[in-house]
Amino acid sequence: MPQISVRGIEMPESPIRKLAPLAYAAKEKGIHVYHLNIGQPDLPTPKAAIDAIKNIDRSILEYSPSQGYLSYRKKLVGYYSKYNINLTPEDIIITSGGSEAVLFSFLACLNPGDEIIVPEPAYANYMAFAISAGAVIRTITTTIEEGFSLPKVEKFEELINEKTRAILICNPNNPTGYLYTRREMNQIRDLVKKYDLYLFSDEVYREFIYTGSPYISACHLEGIENNVVLIDSVSKRYSECGIRIGALITKNEEVRKAVMKFCQARLSPPLIGQIAAEASLDEPAEYGREVYDEYVERRKCLIDGLNRIPGVYSPIPMGAFYTVAKLPVDDAEKFCEWCLSEFNYEGETVMLAPAAGFYTTPGIGKNEVRLAYVLKKEDLVRALFVLRKALEAYPGKV
């Protein structure tokens, strides 16, 4: 029988989704599963987007332009200007989700064997996209004890060699909820400038910042305009994960030309998704305020509740809608599996994402989990209670 590719063998399983069969089996038994494992917002999609889809009046659902509709890109220029990010429509390429923007960034900017420095824990699919592009992820570890703040510049420079081509950040961060400070962003800028690296900056959670700290975009950093490739998506801010619309943004004309070749090869981003995403920009500002206020309350509910459970510790996330928590267990992945396959409390259980899958360094994050606060508060309260009961009953607790 023919063998699968090395790429297929090396492709990692998603720590977010790989326990899904166990969750399905639990539900088949009639057990209610509280999903804290995946960043699927439960808040309503903007009415403007839903109405735009319902009111589509076209006789043909044709290909859209490979770079996305100009009308949508023009509206995005106005959206980004609110964050002091000054763009033209030509700087913006619409992609099939933020994931495609990451992949096309790698394909356009990196050669096989080139290395990308990424702070860990990191969004697990970055590794998958790097493998797809033949690139190599080199991680610099941040720790829960330090609140996931960046290490000093010397730690970065220890990793930089002739193969280093880029730094990749997610700000605010998935999975930790950490928000990079101005000092940290300037540190990254200086490294990018000194070693002439690309800076891939995933900024899909910019709407969700819960402190007085400012949002510092990679596009705000002076002197590296042609090094920056910004990754964006409508999935989280508008609860539109299913329409698969993202954006790749750069002032670097050569990068845009290269990216467009990959865009043309995949033909076009989703037509209907663009219609919905463009309409979302017309939603009254009240929508965004209500969503933000809801996440503020959920964040407090989850973090306060976690830190009241004996042996559990979570730092306070400053952005996004995730946190990484340390549990009093010997192996968080085994605990997550046990919760779905062997435990329930009054017919309920919880699904968490083992955090080890967000690290590449072996052994790190073994007793950590990522939780997403994408459930209404009463469900979060109940999920925390069930989690407490699970930890009390777990045979591998420490």
Give the role of each language-model region.
Residues 2-4, 8-14, 19-32, 38-56, ...:
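PLP-dependent class I/II
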Residues 63-96:
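Conserved N-terminal alpha-helix of the aminotransferase class I/II PLP-enzyme fold
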Residues 59:
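Basic nucleic-acid-binding alpha-helical/helix-turn surface characteristic of O6-alkylguanine DNA
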